[in-house]
Amino acid sequence: MQHLVLIGFMGSGKSSLAQELGLALKLEVLDTDMIISERVGLSVREIFEELGEDNFRMFEKNLIDELKTLKTPHVISTGGGIVMHDNLKGLGTTFYLKMDFETLIKRLNQKEREKRPLLNDLTQAKELFEKRQALYEKNASFIIDARGGLNNSLKQVLQFIA
């Protein structure tokens, strides 16, 4: 078994699904944003504000290469922009948690939106969402309809890997 890599826009449920998959499959769960945040000693928002998005993307790209060297399979929850890296290919089996923009925004309360620097301006966020759609689909081994909630997404992933 390869790594199971969850991709999708901010708020699509990657972190929650990763935890459930980890429990169901008895695999360790890794969260790329959390790993970067712990290593740098700043939240993702603080990294963007203090070090810039380019530095965050560099940390992300380097982490992908590092994760490729792990010998045992993991469930990996990724940041929404990870699909911008050409080295994502080969990390594992990727599952795109697909959801429309309006549903994503409804799922995130104000506090959650404040943690995500790229959601400050909803018009810009929607443009980013639309731009990334093709990248998510291009990088996906499988597309998960994430609108049906966590349990539904979990069932879909488990069916694909059965």
From Swiss-Prot:
Broad enzyme group: transferase
Gene Ontology MF annotations: ATP binding; magnesium ion binding; shikimate kinase activity
Gene3D superfamilies: P-loop containing nucleotide triphosphate hydrolases
Pfam families hit by this protein: SKI
Binding positions for Mg(2+) per the UniProt entry: 15
Pathway listed: Metabolic intermediate biosynthesis; chorismate biosynthesis; chorismate from D-erythrose 4-phosphate and phosphoenolpyruvate: step 5/7
Subcellular location: Cytoplasm
The enzyme's E.C. designation: 2.7.1.71
One Gene Ontology term from the biological process aspect of the record: chorismate biosynthetic process
Chain residues that bind ATP: 11-16, 116
Reactions catalysed, as given in the entry: shikimate + ATP = 3-phosphoshikimate + ADP + H(+)
Keywords assigned by UniProt, alphabetized: Amino-acid biosynthesis, Aromatic amino acid biosynthesis, ATP-binding, Cytoplasm, Kinase, Magnesium, Metal-binding, Nucleotide-binding, Transferase
A GO CC annotation given for this chain: cytosol
Role played: Catalyzes the specific phosphorylation of the 3-hydroxyl group of shikimic acid using ATP as a cosubstrate.
Name of protein: Shikimate kinase
